Amino acid sequence: MAVPKKRTSTSKKRIHKNIWKRKGYSIALKAFSLAKSLSTGNSKSFFVRQTKINK
């Protein structure tokens, strides 16, 4: 089993954590932007099939 040899410093931990958070934030922002464009109908990259409901 792999075991780290030295303790990771607090500043390095913080740096790694911030990078990880930033990645998540940017992905969430892209997803939100895509959802917004789909809901308004301005999407150029997604084609949503419109289905007509007959009553």
From Swiss-Prot:
Q: Report the locations given in the UniProt record.
A: Plastid, Chloroplast
- Which of UniProt's keywords are assigned here? Chloroplast, Plastid, Ribonucleoprotein, Ribosomal protein
GO CC, sorted alphabetically, is: chloroplast; large ribosomal subunit
- Annotated membrane-spanning segments are none
Example GO biological process: translation
For this protein, the record's Pfam families field holds:
Ribosomal_L32p (PF01783)
The family note in this entry says: Belongs to the bacterial ribosomal protein bL32 family.
Q: What is this protein called?
A: Large ribosomal subunit protein bL32c
Species in which this protein is naturally found: Nicotiana tomentosiformis
Q: What is the lineage of its organism?
A: Eukaryota, Viridiplantae, Streptophyta, Embryophyta, Tracheophyta
